[in-house]
Amino acid sequence: MNIHEYQAKAIFADNGILTLKGKVAFSVDEAVSNAKELGGSVWAVKAQIHAGGRGLGGGVKIAKNLDEVKDYASKILGMNLVTHQTGPEGKLVQKLYIESGANIVKEYYLAILFNRMAEQITIIASSEGGMDIEKVAKESPGKIAKVGIDPQIGFKMFHGLEVARVLGLDKDEGKKLISMIAKLYKLYMDKDMNMLEINPLIKTAEGDFYALDAKCSFDDSALYRHPEIAELRDITEENPAEREAAEFGLSYVKLDGDVACMVNGAGLAMATMDIINYSGAKPANFLDVGGGASPETVAKAFEIILRDKNVKVIFINIFGGIVRCDRIANGILEATKNVEVNIPIVVRLDGTNAAEAKTILDNSNLKNIKAATNLKNGAELVKSLVG
């Protein structure tokens, strides 16, 4: 689960992590009122959406007087903000964060995340803050520190010293940053986060470190332990189809392609998407129907993916282990009773009750179903149908 910048900063402040003063606004008048209340002569007017790249998309502006606060707020509030993380459809800006300015001497990048391959918590830090960290990693890898932490040991001084060394901090600056990272690490662990990112982390003229931005992502499976975090969920920021799918036990993520995928198992779903890409087509979604799929959930999956007007072909790839292939076949028939399907369906069914499933589909009057003999053949069929 993701939360907004202003919510993340409130959590930071409650845990002793320095942030600039700021207030959320839901209208232009409230934005101006907040700026007056905060005082000063410089304010940041920030769009609050669950996506990065807001600045490049025009969603973050620096105002040097109240008239500019009003002007920027009126332009940003209600805009459809498109960034590299929103996709071409963008996100509607429904709230702003008005934040006091700061005397910035240097910008850094700092993140804490879980490295599944190494089975460690990893701190990523860079002296190049406020930039795309992937670009920095590609062009200047020496400017990035990657420090692995064994969760059984936790964050120690030597971890922080390595970060401070790569960032080029002096002794006093290093002490301040290490203290901040220790608090962030504890917060990351205590709140069951998947990712914590500050970009940029700033150093002021006074030598203090502040989180100028804040992104926090939490483990959905652990939210029952943190009702105070669960209350921060903003469902207006979530894809309606993804939210509906979750209510039916389906794992669905919308993508930008034109080949809809319906698969059982996350690993097979990823492999299916890979081979679709390899064939030259583009997947329109990730969709895992899970091991307990019923005809009803399969029908719901059909209903959801067919709402995507970009979809030209549906690729159903099922390996019957826990889920039986005949259930999937019956689900396909159930779906076509309630939803008109005018696009081709490529089906690859293997495993438990695959023969029965084939019989069910063969005996149906569905004329737009094509059977695939294997995964590669399925991808080739999909590509030929997409064109």
Swiss-Prot record:
Q: What is this protein called?
A: Succinate--CoA ligase [ADP-forming] subunit beta
Q: Does the keyword Nucleotide-binding apply?
A: yes
Which family does the UniProt entry place this protein in?
Answer: Belongs to the succinate/malate CoA ligase beta subunit family.
Instruction: Give the originating organism.
Output: Campylobacter jejuni subsp. doylei (strain ATCC BAA-1458 / RM4099 / 269.97)
Q: Specify which residues bind ATP according to the UniProt entry for this protein.
A: K46, G53, R54, G55, E99, A102, E107
A Gene Ontology annotation in the biological process aspect, one of them, is:
succinyl-CoA metabolic process
Query: Which top EC class is given?
Result: ligase
Pathway membership, UniProt: Carbohydrate metabolism; tricarboxylic acid cycle; succinate from succinyl-CoA (ligase route): step 1/1
| EC number(s) given by UniProt | 6.2.1.5
Query: From what superkingdom does this record's organism come?
Result: Bacteria
Give the UniProt entry's GO cellular component terms: cytosol; succinate-CoA ligase complex
Q: What does this protein do?
A: Succinyl-CoA synthetase functions in the citric acid cycle (TCA), coupling the hydrolysis of succinyl-CoA to the synthesis of either ATP or GTP and thus represents the only step of substrate-level phosphorylation in the TCA. The beta subunit provides nucleotide specificity of the enzyme and binds the substrate succinate, while the binding sites for coenzyme A and phosphate are found in the alpha subunit.
Could you say which residues form the signal peptide? none
Which is one Pfam family of this protein?
ATP-grasp_2
According to the UniProt entry, its GO molecular function terms are: ATP binding; magnesium ion binding; succinate-CoA ligase (ADP-forming) activity; succinate-CoA ligase (GDP-forming) activity
From the UniProt record, report the name of the gene that encodes this protein: sucC
Q: Give the co-factor note.
A: Binds 1 Mg(2+) ion per subunit.
What is said about its interaction partners and assembly?
Heterotetramer of two alpha and two beta subunits.
Membrane-spanning residues: none
> What are the alphabetically sorted keywords of the record?
ATP-binding, Ligase, Magnesium, Metal-binding, Nucleotide-binding, Tricarboxylic acid cycle
For activity, the cofactor(s) needed are: Mg(2+)
Q: Which reaction does it catalyse?
A: succinate + ATP + CoA = succinyl-CoA + ADP + phosphate; GTP + succinate + CoA = succinyl-CoA + GDP + phosphate
**Source species taxonomy:** Bacteria, Pseudomonadati, Campylobacterota, Epsilonproteobacteria, Campylobacterales
HAMAP family, alphabetically? Succ_CoA_beta (MF_00558)
Give the binding site residues for Mg(2+): N199, D213
Annotated residues that bind substrate are located at N264, G321, I322, V323
